[in-house]
């Protein structure tokens, strides 16, 4: 991914006119929701890393975020605890210093499986990105029963390099299902069984936007959400985009837009807790990172 080396933040989304792959987009309507988390550079949960990478909600609505030094790497995995049952301006609290984890690679996306191969909860991080950091490995991060970060293992995928990965425990009639994505290709995998085999390419011409970079994806019982960020080839007036597909890769809603704010704000990932959706934006100019609601 051609990244803007910047400071992360998370913004809400806005919807635009549906378009075909690689077609120019029209102006979108901002669908930004309320801020739920603000992450300044001084936060202990980022350990001096300035770039927000993958993000996912885990057990009990805890939030896990990868921060890195951009092309310099040195990723860390941070954990944020839910602060009560009310969604407000401080919905998560930093659990302390993050874990240095070189095996995360680029850490472009995070998925959460509450019972990975029957062995309990785990995060799954993509080591690769769209093109700048190609890698077909993913890193399994085992979690304790309380969501604490534990041991890791690396798994090689037969799909080749992927940039986005998600898991839904409620998909496939409750059997669970994975989705993986890179550019126009979408693969799925049953919820059970090793990730080293069993993948199916379900579509090779997904709708997405030109002059944008692959970022994280999220999935639920019936849908998959894909994020495309601004990059160094995007016009100054360009937007970030989210696309909603069904599990066959068919369009449900296209060009859900997030303002790029003159190439300041770069979407990185999308995740949900129950019916609440959140997006993560990496920002330039020393601005604090933020997690905000996606209003549907």
Identify what each model region corresponds to.
Residues 61-69, 118-132, 172-182, 222-234, ...:
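Short beta-strand elements that form the blades of beta-propeller/WD-repeat-like
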Residues 85-127:
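Blade-loop segments of beta-propeller domains
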Residues 41-75, 106-109:
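Beta-strand-rich domains and repeat architectures in extracellular enzymes and scaffolds
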Residues 1-27:
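Secretory targeting and sorting signals
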Residues 207-247:
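Loop/turn-rich, solvent-exposed surfaces of beta-rich toroidal or solenoidal domains
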Residues 33-46, 88-101, 150-157, 197-208, ...:
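A short beta-strand motif characteristic of beta-propeller blades
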């Amino acid at each position: 991914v051609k990244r803007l080396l910047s400071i992360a933040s998370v913004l809400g989304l806005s919807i635009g006119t549906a378009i075909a792959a690689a077609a120019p987009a029209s102006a979108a309507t901002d669908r930004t929701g309320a801020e739920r988390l603000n992450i300044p550079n001084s936060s202990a949960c980022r350990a001096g890393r300035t770039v927000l990478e993958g993000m996912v909600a885990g057990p009990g609505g805890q939030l896990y975020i990868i921060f890195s030094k951009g092309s310099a790497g040195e990723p860390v995995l941070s954990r944020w605890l839910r602060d009560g049952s009310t969604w407000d301006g401080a919905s998560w609290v930093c659990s302390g210093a993050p874990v240095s984890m070189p095996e995360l690679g680029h850490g472009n996306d995070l998925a959460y499986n509450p019972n990975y191969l029957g062995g309990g909860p785990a995060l799954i991080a993509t080591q690769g990105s769209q093109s700048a950091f190609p890698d077909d490995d993913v890193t399994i991060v085992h979690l304790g029963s309380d969501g604490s970060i534990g041991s890791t293992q690396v798994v090689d995928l037969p799909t080749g390099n992927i940039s986005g990965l998600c898991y839904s425990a409620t998909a496939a009639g409750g059997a669970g299902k994975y989705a993986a994505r890179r550019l126009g290709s979408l693969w799925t995998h049953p919820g059970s069984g090793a990730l080293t085999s069993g993948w199916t390419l379900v579509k090779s011409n997904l709708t997405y936007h030109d002059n944008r970079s692959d970022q994280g994806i999220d999935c639920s019982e019936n849908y998959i959400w894909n994020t495309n960020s601004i990059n160094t080839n995007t016009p100054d007036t360009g937007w970030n985009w989210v696309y909603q597909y069904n599990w066959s890769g068919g369009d449900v809603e296209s060009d859900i837009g997030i303002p790029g704010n003159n190439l300041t704000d770069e979407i990185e990932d999308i995740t949900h807790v129950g019916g609440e959706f959140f997006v993560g934006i990496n920002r330039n100019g020393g601005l604090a990172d933020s997690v905000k609601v996606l209003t549907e």
